A protein has these predicted regions:
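Internal nucleotide-binding/catalytic subdomain
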Residues: 1-71
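Gly/Ser/Thr-rich active-site loops/lids in small-molecule metabolic enzymes
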Residues: 12-24, 68-88, 125-141, 183-185
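Generic structural signal for well-ordered, non-membrane alpha-helical segments
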Residues: 16, 20, 24, 28, ...
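Short alpha-helical interface elements
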Residues: 31, 52, 56, 60, ...
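Structural beta-strand/beta-sheet cores of well-ordered domains, especially the beta-sheet scaffolds
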Residues: 43-48, 55-62, 73, 82, ...
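Glycine-rich phosphate/pyrophosphate-binding beta-alpha loops
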Residues: 63-75, 116-118, 147-149
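Peripheral (often C-terminal) accessory segments that flank ATP-dependent C-N-forming ligase machineries
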Residues: 88-201
């Protein structure tokens, strides 16, 4: 079934430097140039949803926002000031900024979802264990389909939380993320158990 994304992990060994250069040259730069030719210059975050196939890179979609859940592990690794970056983008002065600083460690994000997602699901379930999950070393819990009702965090959507962790390796980041996932409970909570496995084989 088609979901909004159930996990993410950067950097991935599945994408080489050559592949990144090719994506920039064949997808991103032509897109920006075409927008300018159409007199629709773009300032902001342009997220390209791509699929790597045997025939090369295929564009699935563009979004004028960060990807979800791709943003969560990227923000865990970003050491530069995000506000400075966004303001420089809006003011068209990106070239004035120094190179971005990144934590060299990989990050893994695991999306916790409501039972039934991506089909029909129920909401309003109390979420427990958030403090315990946040206490896991190098882990953070990003909220998506949640709300605060009478002092209790409850589910309000299909994709509920993005549990994300840094690690010394992809395997270690996965271990930390799933350690935090195991702390969190609500009726019908589920997640994939194989996020980042393709990068470890």
């Amino acid at each position: 079934p088609n979901t909004g994304g159930m996990g993410a992990y950067p950097p991935t060994p599945l994408v080489t430097e050559d592949m990144l250069r090719s994506i920039e040259a064949k997808v991103l730069v032509p897109t920006v140039h075409q927008l300018k030719r159409m007199r629709r210059p773009f300032k902001g975050v342009l997220y390209a949803g791509l699929m790597i196939t045997k025939q090369g890179v295929k564009v699935l979609e563009y979004n004028a926002r960060f990807g979800d859940p791709e943003c969560q592990p990227l923000m865990m690794r970003l050491q530069s000031d995000l506000l400075d970056l966004l303001e420089a983008t809006a003011d068209e002065r990106l070239e004035e900024l120094p190179d971005l600083l990144w934590d060299p460690r990989p990050a893994v994000c695991v999306v916790m979802a409501s039972e039934g997602y991506p089909g029909s699901y129920t909401t309003g379930h109390a979420i427990r264990g958030l403090a315990e999950a946040a206490a896991v070393a190098e882990a953070k819990v990003f909220h998506a389909g949640t709300a605060l009702r009478d002092g209790q965090v409850i589910t309000t959507g299909g994709r509920v939380l993005g549990v994300t962790a840094l690690g010394s390796s992809i395997a270690n980041a996965k271990l930390q993320a799933y350690t935090a996932v195991k702390c969190i409970r609500w009726e019908g909570a589920w997640c994939r158990t194989d996020i980042s496995d393709k990068a470890q084989h």
